[in-house]
Amino acid sequence: MNTHLSHLKSMFLQGTVSDLLYSVKKDYCSHPSLKNNQLVLTTQSGLPEISADPERLIQVVTNLISNAERHTQNGTITISLTGEPGWQTICVSDTGTGMSEEMRKNALKGYISADKDYWRHGIGLYVCHQIITAHGGKIWLKSKEGEGTQVFFSLPEEES
């Protein structure tokens, strides 16, 4: 675990992940950058609170929405929250341009390319990866060129 992220375990989310996502959606919908995209949020009810740094979770979700809106026009960006025993999973999906197989494989590694947009995309996902793993979680993505992207991350309900 990175030293500068090691303090995350001591932070606590006040409220549920669902509450945090509703707040992010409300704040993000006021941004003029949505490019005529619809931002949709679906959450599973009854999920317990988790131990997490809310500022870092907001950073991750906001970055994922920003990536989605940058690659989607006149489409839909969906944030979903689901739970299974011991874990809560957030997915930010879009109906945008999607990624090539090479880009998808390297996105979480912080791969830097000469392509300016690819560099920005890869570094942002790398930072998200670092934050989620510092919380004891995992992050992965699915994407296909021309069909959009889904970025998932799961967080443990109990501290690991």
Where are these regions (language model features)?
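Short helix-loop "hinge" at the ATP-lid/N-box region of the Bergerat-fold HATPase_c
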Residues: A68-E69
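Short conserved segment of the HATPase_c
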Residues: M99-Y111
